[in-house]
Amino acid sequence: MMMMSLNSKQAFSMPHAGSLHVEPKYSALHSASPGSSAPAAPSASSPSSSSNAGGGGGGGGGGGGGGRSSSSSSSGSGGSGGGGGSEAMRRACLPTPPSNIFGGLDESLLARAEALAAVDIVSQSKSHHHHPPHHSPFKPDATYHTMNTIPCTSAASSSSVPISHPSALAGTHHHHHHHHHHHHQPHQALEGELLEHLSPGLALGAMAGPDGTVVSTPAHAPHMATMNPMHQAALSMAHAHGLPSHMGCMSDVDADPRDLEAFAERFKQRRIKLGVTQADVGSALANLKIPGVGSLSQSTICRFESLTLSHNNMIALKPILQAWLEEAEKSHREKLTKPELFNGAEKKRKRTSIAAPEKRSLEAYFAIQPRPSSEKIAAIAEKLDLKKNVVRVWFCNQRQKQKRMKYSAGI
């Protein structure tokens, strides 16, 4: 039973050390205790041999401890001596082991420590972000180094940290290897200089809210961090300045159609009462000296009164026509002549109505002479107290009337 345990322990130990040092250990034990029997040597040396086997794997100290656990002092000294010899032979025969067996574990722990140090540096930089870059309490390349060594799994957790320093933002390319971060430092320094002129809220996926405030979107932080900083600024400025102007346009478009219909009807009635045509209104708008407003066609005014224009055009035309209507009514109340408001309304000749007695006299003159001379027309106009032009036009119209009557009678 003891031999099986010894064999199992020797098989677990190094092969060279077992083959070279088993015999000297047994001879040392036999020389230390000559009176002991041969079968007692394995039983007495079993603790020391086991300790020597352990010393071959773990060091000379283990061999010494195994020797002290023996029942006799001589066997203990022999075990310690054997342990020292096996340690020396192991160092001479075995190749040199690596300097750090747990290198991977140390690198992961170092990366975590550097990540925590980077967060501490960033928190310190919050109080100094208004200083120029040469007054920064830390070197930019150190920040790039620590940020590049952060593993990819920490991107989601670290995206919610409000990093405000430009150099810390420029080092978000954490997917690069540790040995290649020196090649990217000029580009990252350039990004840091550009980001100094931007708001801290533009970084890490900051977006403008509906009320103009800056809100952070951690879910899109890795994607937004790789964007051009100027693109982020343009995007944030578009959100910050586009919303108020859009709301202003919406307030102008939000007009009640019933108000437009009521104004169009009132405008039409007032225009007819003033005796102004639609064409006169369109041409008179240029005289109001409204910026960007010229004369309009008669069809535009007609479509406005009949509500056939588009909603936006109705809204744009309403204040212009309202301004003209106020000026026209003011001129009508004050009995002032403002031809620019009516634009040639007084140039239009009114229809002449001839009374019955003058009409019968003209018909008598026409029966005698259908084509009177110019002197005869002047004498008739002076006799009937009419204008010469009125008498001339009446004779011309009467001749056309006679032609139509003869043509219809001949058919």
From Swiss-Prot:
Residues 93-239 are annotated as: Required for transcriptional activation. Residues 53-68, 76-86 have a biased composition (Gly residues). Its main location: nucleus. Expressed in retinal ganglion cells (RGCs). Expressed in mature osteoclasts. Expressed in cells of layers of the superior colliculus and the adjacent periaqueductal gray (at protein level). Expressed in the brain, peripheral sensory nervous system and retina. Expressed in the optical, intermediate, and deep gray areas of the superior colliculus, the dorsal column of the mesencephalic and pontine central gray, and the lateral interpeduncular nucleus of the brain. Expressed predominantly in postmitotic, terminally differentiated neurons. Expressed in ganglion cell layer (GCL) of the retina. One of its GO terms (molecular function) is p53 binding. A motif (Nuclear speckle targeting signal) lies at residues 173-187. Residues 172-186 have a biased composition (Basic residues). Residues 29-95, 154-190 are annotated as: Disordered. Transmembrane segments: none annotated. Residues 347-406 bind DNA. Belongs to the POU transcription factor family. Class-4 subfamily. Isoform 2: Interacts with POU4F1 isoform 1; this interaction inhibits both POU4F1 DNA-binding and transcriptional activities. Isoform 2: Interacts (C-terminus) with ESR1 (via DNA-binding domain); this interaction increases the estrogen receptor ESR1 transcriptional activity in a DNA- and ligand 17-beta-estradiol-independent manner. Isoform 2: Interacts (via C-terminus) with TP53 (via N-terminus). Interacts with DLX1 (via homeobox DNA-binding domain); this interaction suppresses DLX1-mediated transcriptional activity in postnatal retina enhancing retinal ganglion cell (RGC) differentiation. This is POU domain, class 4, transcription factor 2. It comes from Mus musculus. The lineage of its organism: Eukaryota, Metazoa, Chordata, Craniata, Vertebrata.
